[in-house]
Swiss-Prot record:
Role: Channel that opens in response to stretch forces in the membrane lipid bilayer. May participate in the regulation of osmotic pressure changes within the cell.
Gene label: mscL
UniProt GO molecular function: mechanosensitive monoatomic ion channel activity
Species: Fusobacterium nucleatum subsp. nucleatum (strain ATCC 25586 / DSM 15643 / BCRC 10681 / CIP 101130 / JCM 8532 / KCTC 2640 / LMG 13131 / VPI 4355)
Keyword Cell membrane: yes
Gene Ontology process terms (BP): monoatomic ion transport
Bilayer-crossing regions: 15-35, 38-58, 82-102
Protein name: Large-conductance mechanosensitive channel
SUPFAM superfamilies from the UniProt entry: Gated mechanosensitive channel
Bilayer topology term: Multi-pass membrane protein
Length: 142
């Protein structure tokens, strides 16, 4: 009895996991995590050093506002606004990449929909003009 219930539960779980949306979501999360690491490296290792050099050889990761006096054996309390600036740049680059990707996907989907859409039928005006033409042709034949 218990084994049958477990098998049914396993079958339901397998059906759930194999649905397209769940698999697509899992792939998206994995690719997103890898992409996040690439963007973080791009910002930290390429963009921020260039920006720091342009504005006076500043290392953004070292920009802090120290709070109070350091306590022996503990890390200095500080507001690390330089790291915050780096995270903002990270976010903006990721947002830009996602925006461009979505625009590209939407453009491709629109082209696909336009290609697969059936040709529109004649408009009311075209039908009326065709009827008038046919009527005039009948009159001309008499």
């Amino acid at each position: 009895m218990v084994l049958g219930g477990l098998m049914k539960l396993f079958d339901e779980f397998k059906a759930f996991v194999m649905r397209g949306n769940v698999v697509d979501l899992a792939v998206g999360v994995i690719i997103g995590a890898a992409f996040g690491k690439i963007v973080t490296s791009l910002v930290n290792d390429i963009f921020m050093p260039i920006i720091g050099m342009i504005i006076g050889n500043i290392d953004f990761s070292s920009l802090v506002i120290k709070l109070g006096e350091p306590v022996e054996g503990a890390e200095q309390a500080a507001i690390r606004y330089g790291m915050f600036i780096q995270e903002i740049v990270n976010f903006l680059i990721i947002a830009l990449c996602v925006f461009v990707a979505i625009k590209l996907i939407n453009k491709l989907q629109k082209k696909k929909e336009e290609a697969s859409a059936p040709a529109p039928g004649p408009t009311k005006e075209e039908v009326l003009l065709t009827e008038i033409r046919d009527a005039l042709n009948k009159i001309a034949e008499k």
